[in-house]
């Protein structure tokens, strides 16, 4: 790859563009095309989340309670990315979410409910969010599996007063916890069975049904390897705060096998976070810690000196975040990513561009401006794997999506992210909303990644590292888009249209 600046001066270098005193968002800037001598499919998107943790694809699910729990964590890991499980639950519950995601090697997680054979199912709520209920001798996890009841079978059961043991299906064939989809499907075909129980250390951890296997097998296939640790388990991250009781939370997470922790704060350049970084690195030196959030080089340098292994960049740029409006503090995300990356790379600290991602073009911009990964909230909210139930709003199928700075989220515990003390007056820095049903991340993320590859091809970058090299060697050029240019760059001039990306 040629990193010689073009002989004809055209556009601006990032250094010049971002030194003019303006705070730019992703939509404000546009990259100029460069020379192509490779196919889009040849673009290598492998990267690092932290100093020591590699990822096959540069995508991270945000630690929000309407985005990242067990299902999202297992799905993102299977795609080659990673999810950071939120901390808006008690420490033991968060550790259970981490354990659940790591207890299988398929992106299917039903989180089954349990019942004893003598139990009577009176309401569909007894199934929780699972499509079936496991029947064990003790009516809880850890007991002997006697059978299972599918929700649809219970719905069709005329006499709801019958005991579970009277109509449950027999226990299905078992498979090891780390069996892949092909192995599970093979067992189902050979046994003519509609379900397979996943077993680990003699205990059934989940039940996989044929409908789910066929659904997932029908999604696009990625060549990227899954994000798996040395122990063969999915890699999963988790968020934590900077208070004294978060040290106890950290113990639970480490015991659950967490691979990386994110110190979750809206303003990371604080004595509280600096001390927590040093504590984590001294007590658990093998555990990588990501600091943030930051938007300036000064903030970043302080956390780098404290020993962080990664930096989370963004303040007030999320779609549900009102920090810039309420507190008058923050920075345009494009400027923040470039500025922080320009100092972090000198220390070998990867940058996570957190917030402001609405489309694949924003991911291309974030990565090309120096970030190693893009963290997404609203982009993944509303998906099949996001927590919460679908509801209908004005005829549209939606899921709740809320900022961790919203009063609703802070009431559940996320105020630690925004308050350094126990202030009684809580000021919202986020809102509660809804996003439409997006389907499964296993379906739309592969298309998103292909769009990112095509964007990299257009700027002449055959890999994420080469994009960074082109940026820093002044080959990659940008311009600022006027309001009219932004309108022109989108769909315009039509009476009506249908926008489909894949």
Swiss-Prot record:
Function according to Swiss-Prot or TrEMBL: Catalyzes the conversion of inosine 5'-phosphate (IMP) to xanthosine 5'-phosphate (XMP), the first committed and rate-limiting step in the de novo synthesis of guanine nucleotides, and therefore plays an important role in the regulation of cell growth.
Pathway connected to this protein: Purine metabolism; XMP biosynthesis via de novo pathway; XMP from IMP: step 1/1
SS bond partners: none
Predominant subcellular localization, coarse grouping: cytoplasm
Organism domain of life: Eukaryota
Active site (record annotation): 321, 417
Localisation per UniProt entry: Cytoplasm
Cofactor: K(+)
Gene Ontology cellular-component annotations: cytoplasm
Record's subunit section: Homotetramer.
NCBIfam families linked to this entry: IMP_dehydrog (TIGR01302)
Annotated CBS domain residues: 168-224
InterPro entries in the cross-refs: Aldolase_TIM, CBS_dom_sf, IMP_DH, IMP_DH/GMP_Rdtase_CS, IMP_DH_GMPRt
Substrates-to-products reaction catalysed: IMP + NAD(+) + H2O = XMP + NADH + H(+)
E.C. code: 1.1.1.205
Residues noted as binding NAD(+) in the record, renumbered to the chain: 264-266, 314-316
Reported regulation of activity: Mycophenolic acid (MPA) is a non-competitive inhibitor that prevents formation of the closed enzyme conformation by binding to the same site as the amobile flap. In contrast, mizoribine monophosphate (MZP) is a competitive inhibitor that induces the closed conformation. MPA is a potent inhibitor of mammalian IMPDHs but a poor inhibitor of the bacterial enzymes. MZP is a more potent inhibitor of bacterial IMPDH.
Species name: Vigna unguiculata
Protein name as catalogued: Inosine-5'-monophosphate dehydrogenase
Protein's GO biological process: GMP biosynthetic process; GTP biosynthetic process
Keywords: CBS domain, Cytoplasm, GMP biosynthesis, Metal-binding, NAD, Oxidoreductase, Potassium, Purine biosynthesis
Annotated positions binding K(+): 316, 318, 321, 488-490
PANTHER family from the UniProt entry: INOSINE-5'-MONOPHOSPHATE DEHYDROGENASE (PTHR11911:SF111), INOSINE-5-MONOPHOSPHATE DEHYDROGENASE RELATED (PTHR11911)
List of residues binding IMP: 319, 354-356, 377-378, 401-405, 429
Family: Belongs to the IMPDH/GMPR family.
A Gene Ontology molecular function term of the record: nucleotide binding
Protein's gene: impdh
């Amino acid at each position: 790859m040629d990193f010689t600046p073009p002989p004809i001066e055209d556009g601006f270098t990032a250094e010049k563009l971002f030194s003019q005193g303006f705070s730019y968002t992703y939509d404000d800037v546009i990259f100029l095309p460069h020379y192509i001598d490779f196919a889009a499919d040849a673009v290598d998107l492998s990267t690092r989340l932290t100093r020591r943790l590699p990822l096959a694809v540069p995508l991270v699910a945000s630690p929000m309670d309407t985005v990242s729990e067990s299902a999202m964590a297992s799905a993102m890991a299977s795609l080659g990315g990673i999810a950071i499980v939120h901390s808006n639950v008690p420490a033991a519950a968060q550790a259970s979410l981490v354990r659940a995601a790591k207890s299988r090697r398929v992106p299917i997680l039903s989180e089954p409910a349990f019942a004893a054979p003598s139990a009577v199912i009176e309401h569909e709520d007894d199934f929780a969010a699972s499509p079936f209920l496991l029947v064990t001798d003790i009516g809880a996890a850890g007991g002997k599996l006697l059978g299972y009841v599918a929700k649809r079978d219970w719905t069709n059961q005329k006499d709801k007063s019958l005991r579970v043991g009277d109509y449950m299906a027999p226990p299905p064939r078992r498979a090891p916890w780390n069996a892949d989809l092909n192995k599970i499907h093979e067992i189902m075909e050979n046994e003519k069975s509609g379900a397979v129980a996943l077993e680990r250390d003699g205990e059934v951890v989940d039940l996989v049904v044929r409908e789910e296997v066929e659904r997932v097998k029908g999604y696009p296939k990625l060549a990227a390897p899954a994000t798996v640790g040395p122990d063969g388990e999915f890699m999963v991250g988790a968020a934590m705060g900077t208070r004294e009781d978060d040290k106890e939370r950290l113990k639970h997470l480490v015991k659950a096998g967490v691979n990386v922790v994110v110190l979750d704060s809206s303003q990371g350049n604080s004595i509280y976070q600096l001390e927590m970084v040093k504590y984590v690195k001294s007590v658990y030196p093998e555990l990588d810690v990501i600091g943030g959030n930051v938007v300036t080089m000064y903030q970043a340098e302080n956390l780098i000196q404290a020993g962080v292994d990664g930096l989370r960049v963004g303040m007030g740029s999320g779609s549900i975040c009102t920090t810039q409006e309420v507190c008058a503090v923050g920075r345009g995300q494009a400027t923040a990513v470039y500025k922080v990356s320009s100092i972090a790379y000198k220390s070998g600290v990867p940058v996570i561009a957190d917030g402001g991602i609405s489309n694949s073009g924003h991911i291309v911009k974030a990565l090309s401006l120096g970030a190693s990964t893009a963290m997404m909230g609203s982009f993944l909210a509303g998906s099949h794997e996001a927590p919460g139930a679908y509801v209908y709003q004005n005829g549209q199928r939606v899921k709740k999506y809320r900022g961790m700075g919203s009063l609703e989220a802070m009431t559940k515990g996320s105020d630690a992210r925004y308050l350094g003390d126990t202030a009684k007056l809580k000021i919202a820095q986020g809102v509660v909303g809804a996003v439409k049903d997006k389907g499964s991340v296993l379906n739309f993320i592969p298309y998103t990644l292909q769009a990112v590859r095509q964007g990299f091809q257009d700027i002449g970058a055959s890999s994420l590292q080469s994009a960074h090299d082109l940026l820093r060697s002044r080959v990659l050029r940008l311009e600022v888009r006027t309001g009219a240019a932004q309108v022109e760059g989108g769909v315009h001039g039509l009476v009506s249209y249908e926008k489909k990306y894949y």
